[in-house]
Amino acid sequence: MIKYYNRKTKNYEIEKIAGEKYLNWTYNSPVGMTILEKFIKKKLFSKIYGLYCNSKISSYKIKKFATDFNINMSHSEKSFNDFKSFNDFFSRKLIKSSRPIADNKNFLISPCDGKIIVYNNINMNNIIQVKGITYKLNDLIQNDSISKTYEKGTCIIARLCPTDYHRFHFLDNGICESTIKIKGNYYSVNPIALNKINNLFCQNKREWSIFNSDNFGKILYVEIGATCVGSIIQTYMPNKKVLKGMEKGYFKFGGSTIVLFLEHNKVIIDEDILTESKLGIETKVLMGERIGTKLN
């Protein structure tokens, strides 16, 4: 059971997890863990499932998935009959009015839909994955000099579950450098897995880039793949000016995670998010929503 905070209703809610029984069996049983280590975490498994999700035959499951998880299709640019495959539906674009951007230049926005948790004043050698499990930033991006930039900074973890909108965006005006790709495994990024696998983010396939933002300094974007995420697609043009809210890229099928690192004294995170984060509880947010304010 995963409890999160809905800041709009100011209530706690329980996340409806796609494939919950499968996840619990895989990560909490000896047989499941054996199959996970031998096959499921490997690229081949995600590649095979990705081929299925790209096929026309996979489109039959779209309506049921949307109904089961209460996905608001009025926000989608396409209707059910327009999707060519499940991946086409999964990486769907939304109409702009469904995700208004908090456009005040001093507002830090969420780059995606998902559940976020925030850690301030981080120790780059002891970053929290979940309570009791930590990792090193250098292990995550494999670049020691850049890692040192974010000592005592802010870490924002945005977890996208399979039912979320899976495109991610720029949280300010600025220029993003080229993406660095790191090969890895394909563990789930669901809290069920995060509580079982040490250094999970540092083991999974991931990509990172430096975003030179106009108002929040150098922001480190890290996109982390997961089980069945066949691809992380970067759609932006490196070293070209982008505007707040513009698309950076998208994930193909599967749950995924974006981890953001901001330098020390660049942002004050909204109090409700900080309060829940201190309790170890994620907060539900939508892309474009304010999550913090520039520290002057």
From Swiss-Prot:
It catalyses: a 1,2-diacyl-sn-glycero-3-phospho-L-serine + H(+) = a 1,2-diacyl-sn-glycero-3-phosphoethanolamine + CO2. It is a peripheral membrane protein. Is synthesized initially as an inactive proenzyme. Formation of the active enzyme involves a self-maturation process in which the active site pyruvoyl group is generated from an internal serine residue via an autocatalytic post-translational modification. Two non-identical subunits are generated from the proenzyme in this reaction, and the pyruvate is formed at the N-terminus of the alpha chain, which is derived from the carboxyl end of the proenzyme. The record marks G255, S256 as: Cleavage (non-hydrolytic). Pathway: Phospholipid metabolism; phosphatidylethanolamine biosynthesis; phosphatidylethanolamine from CDP-diacylglycerol: step 2/2. GO terms for biological process: phosphatidylethanolamine biosynthetic process. The modification Pyruvic acid (Ser) is found at S256. Its cofactor is pyruvate. It is found in: Cell membrane. It comes from the Bacteria. InterPro entries: PS_Dcarbxylase, PSD-B, PSD_type2_pro. Binds 1 pyruvoyl group covalently per subunit. Belongs to the phosphatidylserine decarboxylase family. PSD-B subfamily. Prokaryotic type II sub-subfamily. Catalyzes the formation of phosphatidylethanolamine (PtdEtn) from phosphatidylserine (PtdSer). Heterodimer of a large membrane-associated beta subunit and a small pyruvoyl-containing alpha subunit. This is Phosphatidylserine decarboxylase proenzyme. The gene is psd.
